[in-house]
Amino acid sequence: MIGAQKKQSGKKTASRAVRKPAKKVAAKRTVKKATVRKTAVKKPAVRKTAAKKTVAKKTTAKRTVRKTVAKKPAVKKVAAKRVVKKTVAKKTTAKRAVRKTVAKKPVARKTTVAKGSPKKAAACALACHKNHKHTSSCKRVCSSTATRKHGSKSRVRTAHGWRHQLIKMMSR
């Protein structure tokens, strides 16, 4: 019994394999008929021209709306001009107050420059070994090693200073 059942199942699969390609060919033929129907759908596209005529009627309705909008800005322009004139007058007064503060600032800068000059002379006097007042004009001459006087004052620059450390690193 078991052997007979296996033979029957084998016959069914063989018959199904033969029937499947026949169904696929029939399906392809139906698709070709659908392409013929698409040409019939293109004919109602000519009727859409009648719908375009109704669109032209809508433009006439829009023209009436534009006339009402044109009347509104004429009223707004009169109110806007009055407000602009008042604000411009206020802005000019504000700019005048700012210019007065700018004139005061250079006076404060002059005082800072005067304070900085004695600080530079005091700091440079330590590096100067000559018996005269150190100024910015003689800074290069006094700081050079060739014209420096040794003896009375202690040596300011040492071999372990950061300048000498850079010179040693560059020479290596």
From Swiss-Prot:
**UniProt KW keywords:** DNA-binding, Repeat
Regions of biased composition (Basic residues) lie at: 8-77
Q: Which domain of life is it from?
A: Bacteria
Might you name a Gene Ontology BP term for this protein? Answer: chromosome condensation
* Any Pfam family: HC2
Q: What would you give as a GO molecular function for this chain, any one?
A: structural constituent of chromatin
What is known about what this protein does?
Might have a role in establishing the nucleoid structure of elementary bodies.
**Could you say which protein family the record assigns here?**
Belongs to the histone H1/H5 family. HCT subfamily.
InterPro entries of this UniProt entry? HC2 (IPR009970)
User: Which portions of this protein are annotated as coiled-coil regions?
Assistant: none
**Region described as Disordered: spans on this chain:** 1-77
Q: Which organism is it from?
A: Chlamydia pneumoniae
| Protein name as it appears in the record | Histone H1-like protein HC2
TM segments?
Answer: none
